[in-house]
Regions:
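Transition segment at domain starts
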Residues: 1-41
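N-terminal non-cleavable signal-anchor helices
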Residues: 15, 27, 32, 54, ...
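Beta-sandwich interaction modules
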Residues: 34-41, 74-122
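Structural beta-strand segments of beta-rich domains
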Residues: 42-46
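Residues within well-ordered beta-strands of beta-sheet-rich folds
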Residues: 47, 60, 104-106
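Extended, surface-exposed interaction regions
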Residues: 47-50, 96
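Extended, low-complexity, turn-rich repeat/linker tracts enriched in Gly/Pro/Ser/Thr and Asp/Glu
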Residues: 49-57, 110-114
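Short, surface-exposed beta-strand/strand-loop-strand elements in extracellular ectodomains
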Residues: 54-74, 117-121
């Protein structure tokens, strides 16, 4: 089956910290995952693009049909550090397996850079 649904977990997000500001956390959109529409579908592909980012991308999923903050759990994480040039300019994807009803993306400790996008497809 080809993937035909592409949803934005986190749109372009920019933070140009000159060193005088504190890192902060960004939570993206809550979107329906594959199991929301397709019942037993458990394969999702998450793609993302960073430009000079320092922060931690966390993909979360939930099995709840009306999720509260306590219903979310981490399903994937990648750290980026612009100072050390570790994943700071990364364009990548990963396949995630799970019967998630909803998914969302977070950038924790966002200290600098541009998150161009974080998307899920199924």
């Amino acid at each position: 089956m080809s993937q035909s649904t592409i949803l934005t977990l986190l749109p372009e997000t920019v933070y140009h910290n000159d060193g005088t500001s504190q890192p902060y956390d960004v939570t993206g959109n809550t979107v329906q995952a594959a199991s929301y529409y397709l019942g037993n579908q458990d394969l999702q592909t998450v793609s993302f693009s960073f430009s000079e980012v320092t922060g931690n991308l966390v993909i979360e999923g939930t099995l709840a049909s009306t999720p509260s903050d306590d219903d979310w759990f981490k399903v994937y994480e990648v750290s980026a550090n612009n100072q050390a040039n570790t994943n700071a300019n990364l364009k990548s994807f990963t396949n995630l397996t799970g019967n998630f009803v909803y998914m969302r993306a977070k950038i924790n400790d966002f200290n600098h850079g541009v998150v161009n996008f974080v998307k899920v497809s199924y």
